[in-house]
From Swiss-Prot:
Peptide chain release factor 1 directs the termination of translation in response to the peptide chain termination codons UAG and UAA. The modification N5-methylglutamine is found at Q235. This is Peptide chain release factor 1. InterPro entries: PCRF, Pep_chain_release_fac_I, Pep_chain_release_fac_I_sf, Prokaryotic/Mito_RF, RF-1. Belongs to the prokaryotic/mitochondrial release factor family. The keyword Protein biosynthesis applies. Its main location: cytoplasm.
Length: 359
């Protein structure tokens, strides 16, 4: 295990103790809100540092006792048992702190824009895109998040050719960001008379929702066009007679929104445009960092096949971490935590390896 950054631990603890003092001094309401937010961010790591230091002091006391040759044999045996237990506890605490002290992704606490597009497979791909959207809807509901459809183009046989939604709630992006990529399904379509298994795919993109302060969009860099809305006529389309299309001229990114009012159209389209530009900048910065240290960690390449859903076998396989679960029905019902937790653990282990390589 890599050496803990003791100097950084000191800085975190000093900052946390300063915040505790400032909050107790009765600051203004605005200042208190900011302090409380930072307090919440640092509380777990600060408490872990304090607990580790207490356990390390206990271990040092036991070592001092065991170094005394004159102590009674029975007391020595008890002290040795205590030392093993405390040493194990210290190692566990150190591993936990290694993870807590990893560099934070500034986007982790942001809301997200979820985009799902049917890929190869025609009607079956659109149906699968619909299944994926419902899976994420159920997962969001379990976590108390809110899902709001921004735009949708329905498939001719059901499902979606494309659906875009905003997902809001605590820690949304931190949980969903590893879902970006190509999702593949293997199953027998309802229209397949011979019972043959078909393979189709859908692409998922999860973008952190950007604020105005995250992305500076100059008025002269965008073109706004109003046009008639079009779609398959489902519940999420044709809610207004016209739609707004915003084109970001420097990048060529185009966003279309068909909300119930022109004001909502423009606001929604700008929300998605900001998210896409923010994601583009994050990807560029991540690629530069990866190139610099020659190690890629969780790039979320959307051309990468990340997961296969095999219905005949009731199997879900995440190819990035070689995880296979035989609980497809439950996963499709939104029970994604086991998969997402494994992906986060894998990501953290890669970050730890990168930190060790750089230290």
């Amino acid at each position: 295990m890599a050496e803990l950054p003791r100097e950084r631990m000191d800085q975190v603890l000093k900052r946390f103790e300063l915040i505790e003092t400032q909050m107790a001094a009765g600051p203004s309401p605005d200042a208190y809100v900011k302090l409380a937010s930072e307090y919440s961010e640092l509380q777990e790591v600060a408490n872990s540092i304090r607990a580790l230091r207490k356990a390390e002091a206990e271990l040092e006391d036991l070592d001092t006792m065991l170094a005394d040759k004159s102590i009674d044999r029975e007391i020595r045996e008890l002290a040795e048992i205590d030392r093993e237990e405390v040493e194990s506890r210290v190692e566990d605490m150190q591993q936990k702190l290694q993870v807590l002290l990893l560099p934070k992704d500034e986007a982790d606490e942001k809301n997200a824009i979820l985009e799902i597009r049917a890929g190869t497979g025609g009607d079956e791909a659109a149906l699968f895109a619909g299944d994926l959207f419902r899976m994420y809807e159920r997962y969001a509901s379990e976590r108390g998040w809110r899902v709001e459809v921004v735009s949708a183009s329905e498939g001719e046989a059901g499902g979606y050719k494309e659906i875009i939604a905003s997902v809001t709630g605590r820690g949304v992006f931190s949980r969903l960001k590893f879902e970006s990529g190509v999702h593949r399904v293997q199953r027998v379509p309802a229209t397949e008379a011979q019972g043959r298994i078909h393979t189709s795919a859908a692409t998922v993109a999860v973008l952190p929702e950007a604020e105005d302060i995250d992305v500076d969009i100059k008025p002269e860099d965008i073109r706004i066009d109003t046009m008639r809305a079009s779609g398959a006529g489902g519940q999420h389309v044709n809610t207004t007679d016209s739609a707004v299309r915003i084109t970001h001229l420097p990048t060529g990114i185009m966003v279309v929104s068909a909300e119930k009012s022109q004001h909502q159209n423009r606001a929604r389209a700008m929300q998605i445009l900001r998210a896409r530009l923010f994601d583009m900048e994050r990807s560029r910065a991540a690629n530069e960092r990866s190139e610099a240290r020659r190690l890629q960690v969780g790039t979320g390449d959307r051309s990468e096949r990340i997961r296969t859903y095999n219905f005949p076998q009731g199997r879900v396989t995440d190819h990035r971490i070689n995880l296979t679960l035989y609980k497809l029905d439950r996963v499709m019902e939104g029970e994604l935590d086991e998969v997402i937790d494994a992906l986060i653990a894998d990501h953290q282990s890669k970050l730890l390896a990168a930190e060790g390589a750089e230290s």
